[in-house]
Amino acid sequence: MRGRQKIAIVGAGLGGAAAATLLQQAGFDVEVFEQAPAFTRLGAGIHIGPNVMKIFRRMGLEQKLELMGSHPDFWFSRDGNTGDYLSRIPLGEFARREYGAAYITIHRGDLHALQIEAIQPGTVHFGKRLEKIVDEGDQVRLDFADGTHTVADIVIGADGIHSKIREELLGAEAPIYSGWVAHRALIRGVNLAQHADVFEPCVKWWSEDRHMMVYYTTGKRDEYYFVTGVPHEAWDFQGAFVDSSQEEMRAAFEGYHPTVQKLIDATESITKWPLRNRNPLPLWSRGRLVLLGDACHPMKPHMAQGACMAIEDAAMLTRCLQETGLSDHRTAFALYEANRKERASQVQSVSNANTWLYSQEDPAWVYGYDLYGQQLESGEAA
């Protein structure tokens, strides 16, 4: 006789970790399987909009995040060459008042560590590289490279753009290289202090075919981060990223504003990452398998909403499973897709176009969204 119903989550990134906590808080039995042997504080920043701070409020993490993160009063867009302001998008107290929560920027590793700590001890299993998925009718078996296996009633694929769960649903297909790369660097505050320039808390420098997004990643503002988007004809390197250099950055941003040049001068280590993508998927679930985040709608990071969409997915999937119960997972999955696909696809499209907040516009459709205030639209079971 089978025991209690169980949910397996493949991938313990920001979306998978959010799903684990939200599902556990809703009373579900959850296990998480992550292929990485452990997590490290990778050198990347992240924005958390009010739309997702409201989800962290439900998780009991909002106040901790507010203390950890930087709180920009504006998102500034500036001409990369002249420095002229293209837009001034109010955040800070305006965001709290108009959108219902704070807008913060934070180190991705600090956010991730907080999320992992919020999951019940013993839930997350590291070093679990998924090799095979077996549909056994009334359950799914997951076989891992270390020779172990597990069974679950449903499996959530939160395993990123190279998702094995997506591959099981739709077949093997490499993601599309976008033709752009992202340079990333964390800059110590002491390095910035050597320059008299004003380094704004959240600013995107633009020119015709490239940009640089810059912001603080801590409440103490002792760490400044930039991420770029630069055309790059081919990605023929091995691995997820390669080292870059000040020389490469100076060449890429030749003619840019002196403040940008000072940023490049202040860097100690720069990496370069390919920006990959997928076309919208024809389905998000089948049988006992369901996708969330980059596994089903990866996007270029130009709206600072990719991880936010994964966390929204996790919250909506939890809502739908609460609505139907795990025994009626097909209805839950149909509800989930019906209530997420349009929004996630719209964000994916705008993000890939790299037009977000270039000029003065109202971002309320993104930041003012309250997932828990949305009435569930009906979906037809797959």
From Swiss-Prot:
E.C. number(s) listed in UniProt: 1.14.13.114
Signal peptide from the UniProt entry: 1-25
Observed phenotype of the null mutant: Cells show a complete conversion of nicotinate to 6-hydroxynicotinate.
Cofactor: FAD
Pathway per the UniProt entry: Cofactor degradation; nicotinate degradation
InterPro entries: FAD-bd, FAD-dep_Monooxygenase_BioMet, FAD/NAD-bd_sf
Catalytic machinery residues: 47 (proton acceptor), 215 (proton acceptor)
A Pfam family that the UniProt record links to this protein: FAD_binding_3
Binding site for FAD: 15, 34-35, 47, 108, 130, 294, 307-308
Keyword set, alphabetical order: Aromatic hydrocarbons catabolism, FAD, Flavoprotein, Monooxygenase, NAD, Oxidoreductase, Signal
Keyword Signal: yes
The record's free-text note on cofactor binding: Binds 1 FAD molecule per subunit.
Any GO molecular function: 6-hydroxynicotinate 3-monooxygenase activity
Subunit architecture: Monomer.
Family in the record: Belongs to the 6-hydroxynicotinate 3-monooxygenase family.
Biological role stated in the UniProt entry: Flavin-dependent monooxygenase (FMO) that catalyzes the decarboxylative hydroxylation of 6-hydroxynicotinic acid (6-HNA) to 2,5-dihydroxypyridine (2,5-DHP) with concomitant oxidation of NADH, a step in the aerobic nicotinate degradation pathway.
Name the UniProt record assigns to this protein: 6-hydroxynicotinate 3-monooxygenase
Source organism of this protein record: Pseudomonas putida (strain ATCC 47054 / DSM 6125 / CFBP 8728 / NCIMB 11950 / KT2440)
Lineage: Bacteria, Pseudomonadati, Pseudomonadota, Gammaproteobacteria, Pseudomonadales
